[in-house]
């Protein structure tokens, strides 16, 4: 029983470190891609406008 607890504690500890490192790497990548956010906003606006236009055509108005 003690060995199982020890193993589970070790796995939990290593998993926590791994998640922390991945989160730091993801944050660094997001900081590098700051310019892409403006492009994403434009694409979302076009998508919403196209979606509304398509719904209006489908409804026949």
Curated annotation (Swiss-Prot):
Tissue specificity note: Expressed by the skin glands.
Residues excised as propeptide: 23-44
UniProt keyword terms in alphabetical order: Amidation, Amphibian defense peptide, Antibiotic, Antimicrobial, Cleavage on pair of basic residues, Cytolysis, Fungicide, Hemolysis, Secreted, Signal
Signal peptide start and end residues: 1-22
GO biological process: defense response to fungus; defense response to Gram-negative bacterium; defense response to Gram-positive bacterium; killing of cells of another organism
Location in the cell: Secreted
InterPro entries reported in the protein's UniProt record: Frog_antimicrobial_propeptide
Residue list for modification Lysine amide: 61
Gene Ontology cellular-component annotations: extracellular region
Domain of life: Eukaryota
Function: Antimicrobial peptide. Active against some Gram-positive and Gram-negative bacterial strains. Active against fungus C.glabrata 090902 but not against C.albicans ATCC 12231. Shows very weak hemolytic activity against human erythrocytes.
Family of the protein in this entry: Belongs to the frog skin active peptide (FSAP) family. Temporin subfamily.
Record-given protein name: Temporin-SN2
Organism: Sylvirana spinulosa (Fine-spined frog)
């Amino acid at each position: 029983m003690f060995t199982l607890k020890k193993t589970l504690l070790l796995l939990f500890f290593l998993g926590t470190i791994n998640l922390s490192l991945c989160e730091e790497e993801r944050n660094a990548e997001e900081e590098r891609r700051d310019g892409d956010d403006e492009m994403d906003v434009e694409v979302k606006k076009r998508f919403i406008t196209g979606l509304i236009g398509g719904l209006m055509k489908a409804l026949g108005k």
